[in-house]
From Swiss-Prot:
PROSITE patterns (UniProt xref): SHMT
Cofactor(s) recorded in Swiss-Prot or TrEMBL: pyridoxal 5'-phosphate
Principal subcellular localization: cytoplasm
Site (Plays an important role in substrate specificity): 220
Superkingdom field: Bacteria
Gene name of this polypeptide: glyA
Family recorded in the similarity comment: Belongs to the SHMT family.
Pathway given in the UniProt record: One-carbon metabolism; tetrahydrofolate interconversion; Amino-acid biosynthesis; glycine biosynthesis; glycine from L-serine: step 1/1
Provenance organism: Malacoplasma penetrans (strain HF-2) (Mycoplasma penetrans)
Protein name: Serine hydroxymethyltransferase
Amino acid sequence: MKNLILKEILNNELKRQQGYIELIASENYVSEQILEATGSVFTNKYCEGYPNRRYYGGCEYADQIEQLAIDKAKEIFNAKFANVQPHSGTQANVAAYLSVLKPNDKILAMGLNEGGHLSHGSKVNISGKTYEADHYGVDKETQCLDYDAILKQAQEVKPKLIVCGASNYSRVVDFKKFGEIAKSVGAYLLADVAHISGLIVAGYHPNPLPYADIVTTTTHKTLRGPRSGLILTNNEELIKKINSAVFPGSQGGPLMHVIAAKYLCFDEASKPEFKTYIKNVIDNIAILSQTLKELGYKIIADGSDNHLLSVDLYSSKQITGDLVEQWLEQAKIVVNKNLIPYDINSAKSPSGIRIGSAAMTTRGFTTKEFKQIGLWIHEIIESKGNPNTINKIRNEVDLLVKKFPIYQDIKY
């Protein structure tokens, strides 16, 4: 690296990733071969269109790698069709909407405050500006999806598309019930499985493909790949519409270096050790949930079936998530502040924090380490961010993470 400014920033970020406990639910650590592919010579190649149907010459090897990625994605998800070109999960959703909707059509999706995503019809997002969005939430008592209430709302709204899936929901999503609801009102069903796609591939969460018309996902998070997107379907009538909605509908040339990395991601997820990894992810979040509950914290939906959980700090300890996020980061523990269902506080100072287990499980953390994380979180909160407590735990974190090294051979 010749540019000294960027070299310093890259090395600082490398040290941060090596030295911190990463608990952001949407983050993970990719393998070194995925890092290598993302920085490969495919960065230079432009190739609008699809394999063997390009608008540029010189695409022989680009065609090979994209077809490999398509075939491997279809294999691991048991899908008839895969489009590996979306640049992100949001881009995948934008293309999915474009394939079946017209401007001002109605969609019904999970509300942002209840655990949905910006791209599910939020007013500040293109999805909410282009389509007429209504939102369902969770039951106020259980904080779980209420399928009878969603059915009733769907009958009233009469959407053309129902979106199921979330960015902050810790329980199993019943795709079969969503499929029945969508069918009963004549709507398409889109399953956004960005957070749980790794669990689906490993067999630890039901696959939506038998019930959903379209499935979208990111390829990072629990799939542990590059930051990108993917669209799947078993509905053969939608294949051409989806392809056209991605290119030329919402994107130009695909990022071939990222598609190369996506192929490696899908290949890694097809191995037996990936299934073991996902089981450990689930076990680790379960012990963290149990530890925090025993210490007096309210866990949203009373626990987790996947890789994440949300803590209601405000009702538990009369404190907000932004403060706890800051205190924990000072101790080298990274989480994100998050709204909880029916939150009485603002997005800038919400009642909760969201915690995920995927990244640190990649580094080798077990239930022992995740129990310790719960104890540290509690100790910092009980001290109200006392600098002495934070410094003590920061030193303990330093000792722990050194036992679980990553990217030892990388230096910029």
